[in-house]
Amino acid sequence: MTTQLDSLRNMTVVVADTGDIDAIKKYQPQDATTNPSLILSASALPQYAPLIDEAVAYAKAQSNDKAQQLIDAEDKLAVNIGLEILKIVPGRISTEVDARLSYNTQATVEKARKLIALYNAAGISNDRILIKIASTWQGIRAAEILEKEGINCNLTLLFSEAQARACAEAGVYLISPFVGRILDWYKANSDKKEYAPAEDPGVISVTKIYNYYKEYGYNTVVMGASFRNVGEITELAGCDRLTIAPALLKELQENSTALIRKLEYKGEVKAKPQPLTEAEFYWQHNSDAMAVEKLAEGIRKFAIDQEKLETMLSAKL
């Protein structure tokens, strides 16, 4: 029996959106993505206790300053979890930069270099790592610098066409346009509470971005993210990559209904437009209330979970 997950793998690279090693072993994705919230969840699992202890010991060996120890322990824990995941997935791990640096280009670049150095010291080459950065103007500029250094980036919390366009123009390796969080916003801010998959505003957004990239010949990978239901996933079959939480991977694995490719660009490739200026980026992005609110909210939520992680680690330092 061919499952929907098998069918999806034939047209899209399937990525696991989790830090849970057991789930990754079960569904055998090509890549895996983590974020501060997923690192926090994973840290509560008993099998991760040794990784936390090792990160704390590492931090204590680096510095006597408590504040610096906390930063070092956070970074090392994220990398330790990434290293465990890389033992299972054949492809890449996405590890996220502290969301509180989202509006600071230089600090983002420095944090990314540090994370890469930790991976490199553990014997992992750059081609197995993606550095996750929020798709702010400052984050996109940081990614532009990092890509030129051979550090590939995954630009996340992407909700607007302006963000997608700026990422492609900066030569970013991969973007993660969010689907479910866009749906959440429309449900909360309009009278319409139910959407068929094909009319789901998150699905429509990713479809537009995918077609725009193919139409203008951008090489940036489109990886749909943040799914609320299987319908959103099947409607985006054919997207370059999709990062999917274990519960939805399970549903896809248990369903054998035929899957039809929905995304495939067959038109001609056009000449690329002039890159957006900073002013144009802000005007276009800020014209979309959903994108403005969801980007800010996403950064706040990741920062809150980063602080919870710090509380847990500081008790051990």
Curated annotation (Swiss-Prot):
* Alphabetical list of CDD domains matching this protein: Transaldolase_TalAB (cd00957)
Example of a GO MF term: transaldolase activity
Q: Specify the enzyme's EC class, one word.
A: transferase
Q: Which pathway or pathways does this protein act in?
A: Carbohydrate degradation; pentose phosphate pathway; D-glyceraldehyde 3-phosphate and beta-D-fructose 6-phosphate from D-ribose 5-phosphate and D-xylulose 5-phosphate (non-oxidative stage): step 2/3
Which UniProt keyword terms apply here?
Cytoplasm, Pentose shunt, Schiff base, Transferase
Pfam families, alphabetized: TAL_FSA
Chaperone listed as a keyword: no
The reaction(s) annotated as catalysed by this protein in its Swiss-Prot or TrEMBL entry are: D-sedoheptulose 7-phosphate + D-glyceraldehyde 3-phosphate = D-erythrose 4-phosphate + beta-D-fructose 6-phosphate
**Localized where?**
Cytoplasm
Active-site residues, record numbering mapped to chain: K132
What GO terms in the biological process aspect are recorded for it?
carbohydrate metabolic process; pentose-phosphate shunt
Q: Which GO terms describe its cellular component?
A: cytosol
Give the EC number(s) listed in the UniProt record: 2.2.1.2
Q: What family does the Swiss-Prot or TrEMBL record give for this protein?
A: Belongs to the transaldolase family. Type 1 subfamily.
Q: Describe the subunit structure.
A: Homodimer.
What functional role does this protein have? Transaldolase is important for the balance of metabolites in the pentose-phosphate pathway.
**Designated name of the protein:** Transaldolase
Species of provenance: Haemophilus influenzae (strain 86-028NP)
The primary gene name is tal
